[in-house]
Protein backbone atom coordinates (compact mmCIF):
# COMPACT_ATOMS: atom_id res chain seq x y z
CA UNK A 1 0.00 0.00 0.00
CA UNK A 2 1.18 3.47 -0.92
CA UNK A 3 1.97 6.12 1.65
CA UNK A 4 0.31 9.52 1.58
CA UNK A 5 3.08 11.71 0.16
CA UNK A 6 3.94 9.46 -2.82
CA UNK A 7 0.23 9.10 -3.62
CA UNK A 8 -0.16 12.89 -3.64
CA UNK A 9 2.94 13.38 -5.77
CA UNK A 10 1.46 10.88 -8.24
CA UNK A 11 -1.52 13.26 -8.53
CA UNK A 12 0.88 16.18 -9.17
CA UNK A 13 -0.01 17.94 -5.92
CA UNK A 14 2.38 20.86 -5.20
CA UNK A 15 4.94 20.18 -2.47
CA UNK A 16 3.77 23.07 -0.28
CA UNK A 17 0.19 21.75 -0.39
CA UNK A 18 1.44 18.26 0.52
CA UNK A 19 3.22 19.79 3.51
CA UNK A 20 0.03 21.58 4.59
CA UNK A 21 -2.01 18.38 4.27
CA UNK A 22 0.53 16.53 6.41
CA UNK A 23 0.29 19.31 8.99
CA UNK A 24 -3.51 18.95 9.13
CA UNK A 25 -3.19 15.19 9.48
CA UNK A 26 -0.75 15.56 12.36
CA UNK A 27 -3.56 17.24 14.30
CA UNK A 28 -6.05 14.52 13.35
CA UNK A 29 -3.70 11.82 14.61
CA UNK A 30 -3.65 13.49 18.01
CA UNK A 31 -7.44 13.85 17.97
CA UNK A 32 -7.76 10.18 17.01
CA UNK A 33 -5.69 9.24 20.05
CA UNK A 34 -7.74 11.48 22.35
CA UNK A 35 -10.98 10.00 20.99
CA UNK A 36 -9.69 6.45 21.51
CA UNK A 37 -8.94 7.25 25.17
CA UNK A 38 -12.58 8.14 25.86
CA UNK A 39 -13.21 8.68 29.57
CA UNK A 40 -9.58 7.81 30.30
CA UNK A 41 -8.50 10.98 28.49
CA UNK A 42 -10.68 13.33 30.59
CA UNK A 43 -12.20 14.95 27.49
CA UNK A 44 -15.78 13.70 27.73
CA UNK A 45 -18.86 15.77 28.54
CA UNK A 46 -19.87 19.34 27.79
CA UNK A 47 -18.44 22.71 28.71
CA UNK A 48 -20.54 25.61 29.96
CA UNK A 49 -19.91 27.56 26.75
CA UNK A 50 -21.66 27.92 23.39
CA UNK A 51 -19.93 28.40 20.04
CA UNK A 52 -20.86 30.97 17.40
CA UNK A 53 -23.56 28.56 16.17
CA UNK A 54 -25.34 28.67 19.55
CA UNK A 55 -24.38 25.04 20.19
CA UNK A 56 -23.12 23.84 23.57
CA UNK A 57 -19.47 22.89 23.15
CA UNK A 58 -18.21 19.46 24.11
CA UNK A 59 -14.85 19.35 25.87
CA UNK A 60 -13.38 17.46 22.92
CA UNK A 61 -14.71 20.17 20.54
CA UNK A 62 -12.56 22.71 22.36
CA UNK A 63 -9.51 20.42 22.52
CA UNK A 64 -9.73 19.59 18.80
CA UNK A 65 -10.18 23.23 17.81
CA UNK A 66 -7.16 24.36 19.83
CA UNK A 67 -5.04 21.56 18.35
CA UNK A 68 -5.91 22.67 14.83
CA UNK A 69 -5.38 26.34 15.57
CA UNK A 70 -1.98 25.79 17.16
CA UNK A 71 -0.55 23.47 14.54
CA UNK A 72 -1.87 25.39 11.52
CA UNK A 73 -0.97 28.87 12.73
CA UNK A 74 2.55 27.75 13.63
CA UNK A 75 3.11 26.00 10.29
CA UNK A 76 3.77 29.08 8.16
CA UNK A 77 1.66 27.56 5.36
CA UNK A 78 -1.63 29.33 6.10
CA UNK A 79 -2.57 32.98 5.83
CA UNK A 80 -5.72 32.45 7.90
CA UNK A 81 -8.04 29.79 9.27
CA UNK A 82 -11.77 29.64 9.91
CA UNK A 83 -13.42 27.15 12.24
CA UNK A 84 -16.92 26.19 13.32
CA UNK A 85 -15.80 27.05 16.85
CA UNK A 86 -14.47 30.56 16.09
CA UNK A 87 -16.60 33.70 15.66
CA UNK A 88 -14.29 35.09 12.96
CA UNK A 89 -11.33 33.95 10.89
CA UNK A 90 -7.97 33.86 12.67
CA UNK A 91 -4.91 35.42 11.05
CA UNK A 92 -1.85 33.29 10.35
CA UNK A 93 1.27 34.09 8.34
CA UNK A 94 0.74 37.10 6.05
CA UNK A 95 2.85 35.29 3.43
CA UNK A 96 0.97 32.00 3.76
CA UNK A 97 -0.23 30.58 0.45
CA UNK A 98 -3.40 28.86 1.68
CA UNK A 99 -6.47 29.34 3.85
CA UNK A 100 -8.10 26.45 5.71
CA UNK A 101 -11.71 26.08 6.86
CA UNK A 102 -12.53 23.23 9.21
CA UNK A 103 -15.04 21.62 11.51
CA UNK A 104 -12.68 20.19 14.14
CA UNK A 105 -15.19 17.64 15.40
CA UNK A 106 -18.29 16.91 13.34
CA UNK A 107 -21.01 14.94 15.11
CA UNK A 108 -19.80 15.86 18.58
CA UNK A 109 -23.17 14.89 20.09
CA UNK A 110 -21.99 11.31 19.41
CA UNK A 111 -18.89 11.62 21.60
CA UNK A 112 -20.47 10.58 24.87
CA UNK A 113 -22.16 7.53 23.30
CA UNK A 114 -18.94 6.32 21.62
CA UNK A 115 -20.37 6.66 18.11
CA UNK A 116 -18.95 8.02 14.84
CA UNK A 117 -17.38 11.49 14.73
CA UNK A 118 -14.87 13.13 12.42
CA UNK A 119 -12.93 16.18 11.26
CA UNK A 120 -13.81 18.00 8.01
CA UNK A 121 -11.45 20.39 6.23
CA UNK A 122 -11.33 22.53 3.10
CA UNK A 123 -8.34 24.32 1.55
CA UNK A 124 -8.34 27.30 -0.82
CA UNK A 125 -5.50 29.40 -2.12
CA UNK A 126 -5.21 32.65 -0.17
CA UNK A 127 -6.01 35.89 -2.02
CA UNK A 128 -2.94 38.10 -2.14
CA UNK A 129 -4.85 41.38 -1.98
CA UNK A 130 -6.76 40.71 1.27
CA UNK A 131 -5.10 40.99 4.68
CA UNK A 132 -4.82 37.98 6.98
CA UNK A 133 -7.67 37.98 9.47
CA UNK A 134 -10.20 39.56 7.10
CA UNK A 135 -13.21 37.25 6.76
CA UNK A 136 -13.60 38.34 3.12
CA UNK A 137 -10.62 36.11 2.30
CA UNK A 138 -12.89 33.09 2.73
CA UNK A 139 -15.64 34.30 0.41
CA UNK A 140 -14.66 31.92 -2.38
CA UNK A 141 -16.92 29.41 -4.11
CA UNK A 142 -16.40 25.72 -3.43
CA UNK A 143 -15.23 25.05 -6.97
CA UNK A 144 -12.05 26.95 -6.10
CA UNK A 145 -11.05 24.42 -3.43
CA UNK A 146 -7.62 22.89 -3.99
CA UNK A 147 -8.17 20.13 -1.43
CA UNK A 148 -10.98 18.82 0.73
CA UNK A 149 -11.36 15.86 3.02
CA UNK A 150 -12.44 14.40 6.30
CA UNK A 151 -10.96 12.07 8.88
CA UNK A 152 -13.42 9.56 10.32
CA UNK A 153 -12.71 8.32 13.85
CA UNK A 154 -14.32 4.90 13.75
CA UNK A 155 -13.16 1.29 14.26
CA UNK A 156 -10.23 2.44 12.11
CA UNK A 157 -9.21 6.05 11.53
CA UNK A 158 -9.84 6.82 7.86
CA UNK A 159 -8.87 9.78 5.70
CA UNK A 160 -11.07 10.52 2.68
CA UNK A 161 -9.58 13.24 0.50
CA UNK A 162 -9.47 14.82 -2.93
CA UNK A 163 -7.13 17.31 -4.54
CA UNK A 164 -9.15 17.36 -7.75
CA UNK A 165 -7.85 14.06 -9.15
CA UNK A 166 -10.44 11.68 -7.74
CA UNK A 167 -11.53 10.80 -4.22
CA UNK A 168 -9.26 8.40 -2.36
CA UNK A 169 -9.48 6.38 0.88
CA UNK A 170 -6.58 6.14 3.34
CA UNK A 171 -6.32 4.31 6.67
CA UNK A 172 -4.13 5.34 9.61
CA UNK A 173 -1.48 2.69 10.23
CA UNK A 174 -1.02 2.97 14.00
CA UNK A 175 2.10 0.81 13.87
CA UNK A 176 4.05 3.31 11.78
CA UNK A 177 1.92 6.42 12.36
CA UNK A 178 1.14 7.23 8.72
CA UNK A 179 -1.89 7.16 6.43
CA UNK A 180 -1.80 4.44 3.77
CA UNK A 181 -3.77 4.52 0.51
CA UNK A 182 -6.29 1.67 0.50
CA UNK A 183 -8.64 2.66 -2.37
CA UNK A 184 -8.02 5.05 -5.24
CA UNK A 185 -10.74 6.76 -7.30
CA UNK A 186 -13.77 5.76 -5.26
CA UNK A 187 -16.98 5.82 -7.30
CA UNK A 188 -20.45 6.40 -5.86
CA UNK A 189 -23.10 4.12 -7.44
CA UNK A 190 -25.50 6.20 -9.54
CA UNK A 191 -28.56 4.39 -8.18
CA UNK A 192 -29.48 3.59 -4.60
CA UNK A 193 -32.17 2.31 -2.24
CA UNK A 194 -30.86 4.09 0.87
CA UNK A 195 -31.55 7.57 2.16
CA UNK A 196 -30.30 9.56 5.13
CA UNK A 197 -32.40 12.34 6.64
CA UNK A 198 -33.46 13.48 10.11
CA UNK A 199 -37.09 12.38 10.00
CA UNK A 200 -37.96 14.18 13.24
CA UNK A 201 -38.07 17.42 11.23
CA UNK A 202 -40.42 16.11 8.55
CA UNK A 203 -43.39 18.28 9.52
CA UNK A 204 -41.28 21.42 8.96
CA UNK A 205 -40.09 20.61 5.42
CA UNK A 206 -41.28 22.23 2.22
CA UNK A 207 -43.85 20.33 0.14
CA UNK A 208 -41.40 18.99 -2.51
CA UNK A 209 -39.23 17.27 0.11
CA UNK A 210 -42.31 16.02 1.98
CA UNK A 211 -43.58 14.43 -1.23
CA UNK A 212 -40.20 12.96 -2.17
CA UNK A 213 -39.68 11.27 1.20
CA UNK A 214 -43.30 10.06 1.28
CA UNK A 215 -42.73 8.31 -2.04
CA UNK A 216 -39.58 6.65 -0.68
CA UNK A 217 -41.45 5.44 2.39
CA UNK A 218 -44.24 4.03 0.22
CA UNK A 219 -41.78 1.43 -1.04
CA UNK A 220 -42.64 -1.10 -3.71
CA UNK A 221 -46.36 -0.31 -3.44
CA UNK A 222 -45.77 3.39 -4.16
CA UNK A 223 -44.76 5.36 -7.26
CA UNK A 224 -41.07 4.40 -6.93
CA UNK A 225 -41.96 0.68 -7.05
CA UNK A 226 -39.05 -0.37 -4.84
CA UNK A 227 -38.25 -0.41 -1.14
CA UNK A 228 -35.84 2.06 0.46
CA UNK A 229 -33.94 1.80 3.73
CA UNK A 230 -33.32 4.82 5.96
CA UNK A 231 -29.98 5.34 7.72
CA UNK A 232 -29.10 8.19 10.10
CA UNK A 233 -25.87 8.47 12.10
CA UNK A 234 -26.33 12.12 13.22
CA UNK A 235 -22.83 12.97 12.02
CA UNK A 236 -22.37 14.20 8.46
CA UNK A 237 -18.99 12.47 8.19
CA UNK A 238 -20.55 9.10 9.00
CA UNK A 239 -23.52 9.46 6.68
CA UNK A 240 -21.44 10.77 3.76
CA UNK A 241 -18.87 8.03 4.29
CA UNK A 242 -21.58 5.41 3.88
CA UNK A 243 -22.75 7.15 0.69
CA UNK A 244 -19.21 7.11 -0.69
CA UNK A 245 -18.83 3.43 0.19
CA UNK A 246 -22.12 2.05 -1.15
CA UNK A 247 -24.28 4.85 -2.50
CA UNK A 248 -27.26 6.68 -1.08
CA UNK A 249 -28.74 10.14 -0.79
CA UNK A 250 -28.07 12.45 2.17
CA UNK A 251 -30.19 15.52 2.71
CA UNK A 252 -30.64 18.26 5.26
CA UNK A 253 -33.45 20.20 3.58
CA UNK A 254 -34.77 23.65 4.34
CA UNK A 255 -37.29 23.69 7.20
CA UNK A 256 -39.53 26.19 8.96
CA UNK A 257 -38.60 25.58 12.60
CA UNK A 258 -36.74 28.91 12.67
CA UNK A 259 -37.92 31.04 9.71
CA UNK A 260 -34.89 33.31 10.10
CA UNK A 261 -32.58 30.27 9.88
CA UNK A 262 -34.04 27.68 7.48
CA UNK A 263 -30.81 25.74 6.94
CA UNK A 264 -28.69 23.59 9.27
CA UNK A 265 -25.36 22.76 7.63
CA UNK A 266 -22.53 25.22 7.07
CA UNK A 267 -21.30 25.91 3.55
CA UNK A 268 -17.59 26.55 4.09
CA UNK A 269 -16.56 23.61 6.27
CA UNK A 270 -19.34 21.06 5.79
CA UNK A 271 -21.23 21.34 2.49
CA UNK A 272 -18.37 22.52 0.23
CA UNK A 273 -15.76 19.91 1.20
CA UNK A 274 -18.31 17.09 1.07
CA UNK A 275 -19.55 18.36 -2.30
CA UNK A 276 -16.00 18.31 -3.69
CA UNK A 277 -15.48 14.74 -2.46
CA UNK A 278 -18.78 13.51 -3.89
CA UNK A 279 -18.42 15.19 -7.27
CA UNK A 280 -14.92 13.75 -7.63
CA UNK A 281 -16.47 10.33 -6.93
CA UNK A 282 -19.19 10.69 -9.57
CA UNK A 283 -21.96 11.88 -7.26
CA UNK A 284 -23.94 15.11 -7.13
CA UNK A 285 -24.07 17.80 -4.43
CA UNK A 286 -26.90 20.29 -4.77
CA UNK A 287 -29.39 22.56 -3.08
CA UNK A 288 -32.94 22.65 -4.44
CA UNK A 289 -31.82 25.68 -6.49
CA UNK A 290 -28.44 24.65 -7.88
CA UNK A 291 -24.94 23.27 -7.41
CA UNK A 292 -23.46 23.73 -3.94
CA UNK A 293 -19.95 24.51 -5.18
CA UNK A 294 -21.26 27.39 -7.33
CA UNK A 295 -22.50 29.33 -4.29
CA UNK A 296 -20.64 32.59 -3.63
CA UNK A 297 -20.38 32.74 0.19
CA UNK A 298 -21.55 35.81 2.08
CA UNK A 299 -20.06 34.83 5.46
CA UNK A 300 -17.76 32.19 6.92
CA UNK A 301 -20.65 30.62 8.85
CA UNK A 302 -23.23 30.72 6.06
CA UNK A 303 -25.70 27.83 6.14
CA UNK A 304 -27.15 26.02 3.13
CA UNK A 305 -29.62 23.36 2.13
CA UNK A 306 -27.96 20.06 1.24
CA UNK A 307 -29.08 17.30 -1.16
CA UNK A 308 -26.16 15.08 -2.12
CA UNK A 309 -25.16 11.54 -3.02
CA UNK A 310 -25.91 9.08 -5.83
CA UNK A 311 -26.36 10.97 -9.10
CA UNK A 312 -29.64 9.51 -10.32
CA UNK A 313 -31.30 9.71 -6.91
CA UNK A 314 -30.28 13.33 -6.35
CA UNK A 315 -31.68 14.20 -9.78
CA UNK A 316 -34.90 12.36 -8.90
CA UNK A 317 -35.20 14.32 -5.66
CA UNK A 318 -34.65 17.62 -7.46
CA UNK A 319 -37.37 16.76 -9.99
CA UNK A 320 -39.92 17.21 -7.18
CA UNK A 321 -38.95 20.90 -7.00
CA UNK A 322 -39.59 21.54 -10.71
UniProtKB/Swiss-Prot annotation:
Which pathway, metabolic or otherwise, does it act in?
Carbohydrate biosynthesis; gluconeogenesis
Which residues make up the binding site for Mg(2+) 1? 84, 103, 105
* Disulfide topology: none
Q: Which Gene Ontology cellular-component terms appear in the entry?
A: cytosol
Taking the first listed entry, what is the main subcellular location of this protein, grouped into a coarse class? cytoplasm
A molecular function (GO) held by this record is: fructose 1,6-bisphosphate 1-phosphatase activity
- Cofactor binding annotation: Binds 2 magnesium ions per subunit.
Q: Where does substrate bind?
A: 106-109, 198, 264
Q: Which cofactor does it need?
A: Mg(2+)
The places in or outside the cell where this protein is found are:
Cytoplasm
Record flagged with keyword Nuclease: no
Query: So where does Mg(2+) 2 get bound?
Result: 103, 106, 270
SUPFAM superfamilies per record = Carbohydrate phosphatase (SSF56655)
Pfam families xref list: FBPase, FBPase_C
Q: Which biological process, per GO, is one annotated for this protein?
A: gluconeogenesis
**PANTHER family per the record?**
FRUCTOSE-1,6-BISPHOSPHATASE-RELATED, SEDOHEPTULOSE-1,7-BISPHOSPHATASE, CHLOROPLASTIC
Q: What is this protein called?
A: Fructose-1,6-bisphosphatase class 1
